[in-house]
């Protein structure tokens, strides 16, 4: 934990030892991809969100994406337990199926205003010519609703909700020094 975080005691940050190994044991279909470079179809998780309604962590997979759809790894976490893999249980996978070929999850965030999640979809590997889209997802179904098409030159990487009450706003940031 950094000195700044220790000083405030409002937030702590620490690694969860053994998490990667635990994750790959729970999702054996991803283990093969974990040994490859991201742009060669390797495992690339870019989005993470907390689902307060289900006490689950959602991990958005950028790559690999198969015929089943874009995987969202859902891992139940006991927030009152110690910070170790022993606090994790009941993993499962949801799939977003109404996406364009070559898309993966670039980010995912809980939307406390409208409920559900905002999901940023884009290239699963660098160089693919697929659209970047800001989507709304209910966290349960296999479908997302496209809220906005974003310019490829923006290279969107992150999204967050600004306000916790209506009207909410979303901020999207990109690699090219841009935001929307």
Pin down the residues of each PLM region.
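Sequence/structural signature of beta-propeller domains
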Residues: 1-180
